[in-house]
UniProtKB/Swiss-Prot annotation:
Residues reported in the UniProt entry to bind Zn(2+): 188, 195, 241
EC number: 3.4.17.-
Organism: Enterococcus faecalis (strain ATCC 700802 / V583)
Family: Belongs to the peptidase M15B family.
Phylogenetic classification of the source organism: Bacteria, Bacillati, Bacillota, Bacilli, Lactobacillales
NCBIfam families listed in its UniProt record: vanY_BG (NF000473)
Superkingdom, taxonomy of origin: Bacteria
Protein name per UniProt: D-alanyl-D-alanine carboxypeptidase
Pfam families hit by this protein: VanY
Length: 268
């Protein structure tokens, strides 16, 4: 009987040791898996945040000049000329009836996520992004400048999408053109328009669109294709598409409830 009890105790001890070892192994496996997942998520978060950032805007102009005229009167005249020049390029109208001028040229700046924009709108877009983040909203530039070839590619994809739904070629083309501009008539080809979406981690699309709708004008941007202006713009509602027109024009457009076509008609 004592021998039997001895063996029983030994077996019980072995089972206990085995179970304890299994628990420790499971615990270590959990800790390692949790650590790996945490590191991966941290890496992804940093990657996304880097992709949302615009390149730093230099505090001073890097050209050879000082940027300040010796004669105050000359400086005032230069400022007035710059404002006039900005109105000329920032208010250019591009739509189905007004294609991009044949000799139109643009100097581009590449953002940290690879998208490009007209270098002249860069500081305003940076200010917009900084203000949004300060309010707890995290946007990204999903699309900036496009070449003619890229615009054609997007158009072809949209036409194919409608054809797959059973539309004829003519119907598919007509429907696609309410969403995608015909190459040569897209504001993206100006470098003045950006499609802005949410980062997908800190903000939702609706949060970003709402913030932009209420605040973008303060930085010179307008919601180019609002839902109640489709008959005028010829483009369906796009809450992500924003166009730089300058702070003065954007403020008037916002407060008067206009689209760019209407604003330009009132300014004639």
């Amino acid at each position: 009987m004592e021998k039997s009890n001895y063996h029983s105790n030994v077996n019980h001890h072995k089972r206990h040791m085995k179970q304890s070892g299994e628990k420790r192994a499971f615990l270590w496996a959990f800790i390692i898996s949790f650590t790996v997942c945490t590191l991966f998520l941290g890496w992804r978060l940093v990657s996304v945040l880097e992709a949302t950032q615009l390149p730093p805007i230099p505090a001073t102009h890097t050209g050879s000049g000082t940027g300040v005229a010796e004669n105050p009167e000359e400086n005032t005249l230069a400022t007035a000329k710059e404002q006039g020049d900005e109105q000329e390029w920032s208010l250019i109208l591009v739509n189905r009836q007004n294609p991009i001028p044949a000799q139109y040229d643009v100097e581009l700046e590449q953002l940290s996520n690879g998208e490009r924009i007209d270098i002249r709108i860069s500081p305003y877009l940076q200010d917009l992004f900084d203000a949004a983040r300060a309010d707890g909203v995290y946007p990204i530039v999903a699309s900036g400048y496009r070449t003619t070839e890229k615009q054609q590619e997007i158009m072809d994809e949209k036409v194919a999408e409608y054809k797959a739904k059973g539309y004829t070629s003519a119907q598919a083309k007509a429907e696609a053109e309410t969403w995608v501009a015909v190459p040569g008539t897209s504001e993206h080809q100006l470098g003045l328009a950006v499609d802005i979406n949410a980062d997908g981690i800190h903000s939702t699309g609706n949060e970003v669109y709402r913030w932009l709708d209420e605040n973008s004008y303060r930085f010179g941007f307008i919601r180019r294709y609002p839902p109640d202006k489709t008959e005028i713009t010829g483009v369906s509602n796009e809450p992500w598409h924003y166009r730089y027109v300058g702070i003065e024009a954007a403020t008037k457009i916002y407060h008067q409830g206009l689209c760019l076509e209407e604003y330009l008609n009132t300014e004639k």
